[in-house]
Amino acid sequence: MSLNRTHRARRGFTLLELLVVMFILVLLAGTVTALVMKRTEDAKHARAKADIASFETAIDLYKLDNQAYPPSLEALRAKPSGDELPNWNGPYVKKAVPADPWGRAYLYQAPGEHNQDSYDLFSLGKDGQEGGAGNDADILNWD
């Protein structure tokens, strides 16, 4: 008889044990999701910084050839119509100017407000607003 009782006690997990395991799994899933989301935002910031560095190189090459900064980022891809640029040696970028990692255009201004003797080039970051910190921080070529 005692053998039969022991056998019944080992048939499965109790509801409490299952709830504890489920709670632990939910905590782990939440932690992993938060870490992945942070890494995704970090990667977007890194891509925006790399894009800006690449544009800076192309803009500097444009200036070397034409003795002036381009009127827009699109001028890196196609010679501006109506401008007399006998030394234009582009395209200075291989593909069309991409959007920033959040789907908005990079902002370019020559002469710059912050770099008055050259140009400002930046992305407004995740929030699309000037300023911000952390994931919402702007990616700038003057900091």
Where are these regions (language model features)?
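Short, conserved catalytic or interaction motifs in soluble domains
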Residues: G30, K38, L64
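Low-complexity, acidic interaction segments enriched in glycine
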Residues: T57-D143
